[in-house]
């Protein structure tokens, strides 16, 4: 792949920052080189965005105009689904089938917000007094910042860019340093779809440089970030200092609960998918497993059988379940947590190491891992590992279970497996999590809001709520009678 250029104000140009590279996690080969954006590039992108969103042609555009662009974006994504899936796989190592699913979900996101902006647009009459007409309307914020992670680039980028554009904003997209390919290709797709110049700029670069400066810039009116909790906490402070909104989708240490009446096969398969798909590199991964003591032995036996049968390999190979981790540095971090778990008294039942297959030697692969023998207070149960590592724990008392499931600084997601729907709903109300799955896991609907409790984030993405998050509300009062205010008489 040729050297990449960054995208600013409708122009492709060489970044002014230091050289950076994109590597294929499956074998370490070079995907592309590019020069990162620098602060001058950032200034130009914000200036271009400010001009573009204030342009009356865009500011006064009817919702169907923005919807048409988003539908065209969806058409272009769908027409190139296989190509984009390969690019996504090269960007972060996801198996092709999984990458293609994310590509298609990105197209669906564009279509959803195309429809949503038409439903939401316009003045809404509100209850009023005699001789007074009151209206409420939603307006764009202006230039907004979207800072995205490396684990699901095209999906997470579209979940920010599509509603922001639908709402009428100009977006500065800062992709993760490790995965610039999809963000830059997304810019090309929006350009081909007819989005006016300046409404989307893409600035690859270091988060500590570009991300921080973007968040601090006085003309940036919202920060939306998906990534680590420490960075999210820093950005929340920056937003608070500026008194601007911040949407933060952060880490997780999600509990999965298996009650004594659960279907063993259904639960084992769902648990396996919930932790080991995406090689465990998902904020929602079900990494803490609580199994009722009466079901512990049979469920663990089936879960181990399924896990040992997972195919770990090159993401372009047929039938692969688990691809590589993003890079060797991250893999070492996962391995360090496994070693820590052993020191804390954990027993590794499967995995816990780098695969011995010489064909995988150049990639950042790690075997799916199941550990038992730890308590919920262990660091491996409290800290986000972000890899294919599951810790299993038996429980007997339901009240103690709820306390332990909620004993985490995180509150992103949870799963429940049971045949008793009423009991599951009762449990779901007691779990401190933004999303609770019952007899399924890691499935989504773009129409349903998503976000976390506690240190898993602030705000919501997806759904109408996810569109309103990119807008500000204005109230208008119009006197309809001829009455005169006599206060100053």
Where are these regions (language model features)?
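Hydrophobic face of amphipathic alpha-helices that form TPR/SEL1-like repeat modules
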Residues: 1-27, 52, 353
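A short acidic/small-residue loop/turn micro-motif
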Residues: 14-16, 20-21, 36-40, 262
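Residue-level signal for inorganic ion chemistry
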Residues: 28, 66, 88, 110, ...
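Conserved C-terminal structural/oligomerization subdomain of aldehyde/semialdehyde dehydrogenase
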Residues: 29-31, 220, 257, 311, ...
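Short, well-ordered beta-strand elements within core beta-sheets of diverse protein domains
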Residues: 31-37, 54-58, 146, 256-259, ...
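Glycine-rich loop-to-alpha-helix module at the N-terminal edge of alpha/beta enzyme cores
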Residues: 31-120
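Rossmann-like NAD(P) dinucleotide-binding subdomain of oxidoreductase/dehydrogenase enzymes
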Residues: 122-266, 395
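ALDH superfamily catalytic-core signature
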Residues: 230-375, 438, 485-489
């Amino acid at each position: 792949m040729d050297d990449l250029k960054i995208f600013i104000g409708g122009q492709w140009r060489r970044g002014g920052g230091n050289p950076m590279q994109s590597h294929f996690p499956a074998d370490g080969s070079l995907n592309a080189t590019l020069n990162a954006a620098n602060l001058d590039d950032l200034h130009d992108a914000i200036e271009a965005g400010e001009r573009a969103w204030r342009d009356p042609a865009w500011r006064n555009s009817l919702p169907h105009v923005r919807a048409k662009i988003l539908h065209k974006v969806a058409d272009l994504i769908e027409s190139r689904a296989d190509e984009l899936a390969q690019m996504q796989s090269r960007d972060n190592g996801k198996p092709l089938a999984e990458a293609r699913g994310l590509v298609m979900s990105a197209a669906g996101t564009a279509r959803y917000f195309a429809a949503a902006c038409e439903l939401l647009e316009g003045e809404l009459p509100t209850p009023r007094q005699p001789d007074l007409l009151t209206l409420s309307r939603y307006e764009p914020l202006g230039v907004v910042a979207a800072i995205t992670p490396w684990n699901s680039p095209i999906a997470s980028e579209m979940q920010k860019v599509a509603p922001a554009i639908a709402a009428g904003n100009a977006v500065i997209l800062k992709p993760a340093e490790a995965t610039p390919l999809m963000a830059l290709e997304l810019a090309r797709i929006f350009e081909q779809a007819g989005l006016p110049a300046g409404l989307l700029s893409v600035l690859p670069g270091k988060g500590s440089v570009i991300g921080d400066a973007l968040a601090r810039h006085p003309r940036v009116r919202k920060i939306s970030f998906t990534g680590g909790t420490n960075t999210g906490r820093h950005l929340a402070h920056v937003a608070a200092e500026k008194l601007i909104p911040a949407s933060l989708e952060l880490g997780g240490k999600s509990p999965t609960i298996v009650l004594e009446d659960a279907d063993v096969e259904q639960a084992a398969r769902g648990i396996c998918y919930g932790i080991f798909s995406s090689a465990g590199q998902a904020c929602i991964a079900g990494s803490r497993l609580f199994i009722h003591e009466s079901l512990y032995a049979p469920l663990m036996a089936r879960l181990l059988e399924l896990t040992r049968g997972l195919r770990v390999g090159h993401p372009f190979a047929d039938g692969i379940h688990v691809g590589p981790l993003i890079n060797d540095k991250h893999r070492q971090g996962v391995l360090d947590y496994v070693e820590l778990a052993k020191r804390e008294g954990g027993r590794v039942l499967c995995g816990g190491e780098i695969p011995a297959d010489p064909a995988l030697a150049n990639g950042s692969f790690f075997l799916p891992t199941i550990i038992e023998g730890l308590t919920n207070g262990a660091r491996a149960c409290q800290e986000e590992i972000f890899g294919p590592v599951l810790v299993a724990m038996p429980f007997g008392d339901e009240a103690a279970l709820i306390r332990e499931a909620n004993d985490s600084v995180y509150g992103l997601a949870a799963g429940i497996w049971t045949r008793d729907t009423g009991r599951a709903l009762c449990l779901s109300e007691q779990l401190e999590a933004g999303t609770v799955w019952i007899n399924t896991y890691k499935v989504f609907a773009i129409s349903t809001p998503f976000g976390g409790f506690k240190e898993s984030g602030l705000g919501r993405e997806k759904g109408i709520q996810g569109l309103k998050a990119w807008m500000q509300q204005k109230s208008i009062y119009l006197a309809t009678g001829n009455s005169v205010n006599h206060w100053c008489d």
